[in-house]
Amino acid sequence: MKFIVFLGAFLWHLMPVSAQVKGMVKDNQGEPVVAANVFWINTTNGTVTDENGTFTIEQPVGAKKLVVSFIGYENDTIVVENDHKELAIILQGSVMMDEVQVVERKIGVVKSRSSVLNQDMISSAELARAACCNLGESFTTNPSVDVSYADAATGARQIKLLGLSGTYVQMLTENIPNYRGASAPFALGYIPGPWMQSIQVSKGSSSVKNGYEAITGQINVEFKKPQTTQSLNVNLFASSKEKYEANFDANVHLNSRLSTGVLAHYENSTRSHDDNGDGFLDMPKVEQYNLQNRWAWMGDQYVFQASVKAMKEDRTSGQATHLHVDNSVGGFVGRELYKIGIHTDRYEAFTKNAYIFDKERGTNLALILSGSLHKQDAGYGYKLYNVDQKNLYTSLMFETNFDERNSISAGLSLNYDYFNQTYRLENDDTGLLYGKEKETVPGAYVQYTYNWKDKIILMGGIRADHSDIYGTFPLKRKIPRSYIRM
């Protein structure tokens, strides 16, 4: 019996015995490191620190090196001897990299894949890159639209699409026909660049919704909306040619549904420039005041928008001085300088009203009312052209989706123009001529669209308008479009 007890004690003494290792892990600030990894090298034995940064781990026979690691700190390896006490481990912060900034510029020009029209959208990012001062200068970075001077003496510009310019391109603001008739020659300068949120350029055949005037395409300008984020922006501009501009826009949310916005613009480029010394101004002198106030009500079913705008502009050009005067034969002595002066007052207003019957199907009924008063007094030497144009436009539209592929829209419209003109066609002091013109054009349209997953889009529409001057004329649109999107 004694032999058995002695043998058991001897074998127990020969068996490997594992000890417990205790310790605490802190950072270099003296704060405990929670959930740090603690393990022996070349073993599967490990643990983590508790909420106080302490740990307890069994030490296998032969294990000497204890590793402590945690994210954001350098690993620490401790050699543990047999006669160790409780370990106190300090983790040092790992090497920190400098801040990395990833900068991306928003896409400036977007090709609309979901639109049946051949449409490019110029976003606010592209407008900022162009550093434009008005609509006419906003296409400098976009090759899809060609803007040229129709008359260098007055600064009148025109847009060319598909090789044709002038009246073949329809101008829209907020999808409402605008800048027609007397306002067309200088319309590209009436819209300040900082006011614009985006521009949609459609080439070729367009929708029948907006009338019959678009032959080569449409250009629609979207202004900054008051219902977007509240903001205050001030934009100042000055050039070496002594052109100065100041722009201001602000949005205020009166409550969760009602908001208003104010946009203001002042332009002054009244210094005379005759760099080539030919006696004529190289560019017209322009001073413009522009002010717009917008309101928006965004209800669950009823949506309302309204805007009023006023603009005043003085534009002068022509001869700056007489050159090559020959006093022996009279020369130009006693003759007046050839001057061009154009004074414009323009007032606009519109309202948009929409009632949504079914949001899922997009069923809605909308009424648009728009009006403008354009008064222009122009003198070209002795020639005169003074015109007062009044325009009224209204449109009633209904739209609905039968399902996710088929939709239809129908509507009625009325456009009224009145011109009161005073002019002199001869370059002398002959008498004035007078003329009054008016035109009323009611119209109706129906348009059907088939859209298969934005890959195959077919649109067909028919429109009929009746002019009290030119009679009735129908307009048909059939625009197929298909592509494969990967």
Regions from the language model: what does each represent?
Residues K26-E31, A36-I41, S69-Y73, D83-A128, ...:
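Short, acidic, small-residue-rich periplasmic hinge/interaction motif at the N-terminus
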Residues T44-T54:
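Short, acidic Ser/Thr/Gly-rich low-complexity loop/linker segments typical of extracellular
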Residues F55-E58, Q158, I176-K203, L291:
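Short acidic/polar hinge/loop motifs at secondary-structure boundaries
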Residues H84-I90, L135-S138, R157-K160, L172, ...:
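N-terminal periplasmic accessory domains that precede
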Residues G136-P177:
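Extracytoplasmic beta-strand/coil segments of soluble accessory domains associated
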Residues Q170, S198-S202, Q218-K224, S231-S240, ...:
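Predominantly transmembrane beta-strands of Gram-negative outer membrane beta-barrel pores used
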Residues S269-N290, A296-L365, G371-Q389:
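Flexible loop and strand-edge segments within Gram-negative outer membrane beta-barrel domains
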Residues R405-S409, S413-F419, N427-M486:
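Structural signature of Gram-negative outer-membrane beta-barrels, strongest in the C-terminal barrel
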